[in-house]
Amino acid sequence: MEEGSSSPVSPVDSLGTSEEELERQPKRFGRKRRYSKKSSEDGSPTPGKRGKKGSPSAQSFEELQSQRILANVRERQRTQSLNEAFAALRKIIPTLPSDKLSKIQTLKLAARYIDFLYQVLQSDEMDNKMTSCSYVAHERLSYAYSVWRMEGAWSMSASH
């Protein structure tokens, strides 16, 4: 019986704390130690610094909060700008009425459209047909592109 009360393997120490609670405590204390090292340069707290530590941490929290708010505003503006750019790109690219393109599909389709236009220009240069880009020419290009796309060129590139 004496052996059971002095056993170092006991899950409860002399203060009545379980091993699980003891495992949690060093982690809790570890955080405090790391925080205190940041607040003092040499690791030893001084009475003057301890009194001032409360207000800078509150000010730091407010600063961090305002920085986070500003970052959120910037991110919202960036996202809005990106969405507007995609909307403009979707207006330029000829699409089918049933198309509801994601951003990646829009980019892939735009790249394919640019390639298509390049091929059209190359074939025009070979034929020495330098025509102006009128409304009718634009409509013909859109139609030709839609036909080209329906033939499977887009479906093959969408899988990549």
UniProtKB/Swiss-Prot annotation:
Protein location: Nucleus; Cytoplasm
Induction record: By TNF-alpha.
One GO cellular component term: cytoplasm
Keywords annotated in UniProt: Cytoplasm, Developmental protein, Differentiation, DNA-binding, Nucleus, Repressor, Transcription, Transcription regulation
Gene Ontology terms describing biological process: cell population proliferation; cornea development in camera-type eye; embryonic cranial skeleton morphogenesis; face morphogenesis; keratinocyte proliferation; myeloid cell differentiation; negative regulation of cell population proliferation; negative regulation of DNA-templated transcription
Gene3D superfamilies according to UniProt: Helix-loop-helix DNA-binding domain (4.10.280.10)
Pfam families reported in the protein's UniProt record: HLH (PF00010)
Main location: nucleus
UniProt xrefs under InterPro entries: bHLH_dom, E-box_TF_Regulators, HLH_DNA-bd_sf, Twist2_bHLH
Expression by tissue: Expressed at low levels in sclerotome and dermatome of somites, and in limb buds at 10.5 dpc. Accumulates predominantly in dermatome, prevertebrae and derivatives of branchial arches by 13 dpc. Also expressed near surface of embryo and in chondrogenic cells. In adult, expressed at low levels in skin, bladder, uterus, aorta and heart.
Positions of region (Disordered): 1-63
Biased composition (Basic residues): 27-37
Domain free text: The C-terminal and HLH domains are essential for transcriptional repression.
Protein task: Binds to the E-box consensus sequence 5'-CANNTG-3' as a heterodimer and inhibits transcriptional activation by MYOD1, MYOG, MEF2A and MEF2C. Also represses expression of pro-inflammatory cytokines such as TNFA and IL1B. Involved in postnatal glycogen storage and energy metabolism. Inhibits the premature or ectopic differentiation of preosteoblast cells during osteogenesis, possibly by changing the internal signal transduction response of osteoblasts to external growth factors.
PANTHER family given in the database record: BASIC HELIX-LOOP-HELIX TRANSCRIPTION FACTOR, TWIST (PTHR23349), TWIST-RELATED PROTEIN 2 (PTHR23349:SF70)
Record-given protein name: Twist-related protein 2
Organism: Mus musculus (Mouse)
Name of the gene encoding the protein in the UniProt record: Twist2
